[in-house]
């Protein structure tokens, strides 16, 4: 089934909500990075968070999220755009921690101490940046804290996954719900009560639940309109041309040393694993281009 996201708003205008299923996208990205189960769960949560945040953007805008902790996973790096494209990676894909009850321990894998940094490219001169301390290191709660503290929007986030014993991603998805200004405290109280009473999101997803069904449970009793449905998929923006521009920015001296010591350069994209090879002739051409630009 194609992954997709649904965006809705209460008829009163007081609440907006997003829900998505990201099973195939999480599976595809984790397969590229050959992640072990706990790293799969952590990266999967980041991917779902990215899809939700991307859906809050306007066309042409992008968001980057960096969860950095003091655990063995080290970091989760995610990029997403307004069109439903997501990519990401973790610091160590071979991390596999379990709780005493046998559940995947994402919180301690990332580490209890650390930061979430969000950068939004809104088409302005400089990206908007916000940073908060990790709250639980479970991803959903950390993202909600960021939205409340940095963007001043009362928000609740739910993200879940179901990983099989062999590491297969059986289900993944989530929701994001926000109170729309002017905020009504009674609306927030009602939403929090409703969220606390929800059945486990992982169970709903594993049973084949779709975004519409998530919204039905989340907004039960609240009249709402569905504004949009959009597909979600892995996409990487790396290219040989982009990598060449990076090499161009390094300068003649460093490229000349690279040519002498390494007889070329091999660059691997951290997001998709694609390898780009530049031989001595390529470096000579780039060095000549730099000299030409310098006049």
UniProtKB/Swiss-Prot annotation:
GO terms for molecular function: protein folding chaperone; unfolded protein binding. Under oxidizing conditions two disulfide bonds are formed involving the reactive cysteines. Under reducing conditions zinc is bound to the reactive cysteines and the protein is inactive. InterPro entries: Heat_shock_Hsp33 (IPR000397), Heat_shock_Hsp33_C (IPR016154), Heat_shock_Hsp33_N (IPR016153). Keywords: Chaperone, Cytoplasm, Disulfide bond, Redox-active center, Zinc. Transmembrane segments: none annotated. It comes from the Bacteria. The keyword Chaperone applies. Disulfide bonds join 236-238, 269-272. One of its GO terms (biological process) is protein refolding. The keyword Chaperone applies. GO terms for cellular component: cytoplasm. It is found in: Cytoplasm. Redox regulated molecular chaperone. Protects both thermally unfolding and oxidatively damaged proteins from irreversible aggregation. Plays an important role in the bacterial defense system toward oxidative stress. Belongs to the HSP33 family. This is 33 kDa chaperonin. It comes from Citrifermentans bemidjiense (strain ATCC BAA-1014 / DSM 16622 / JCM 12645 / Bem).
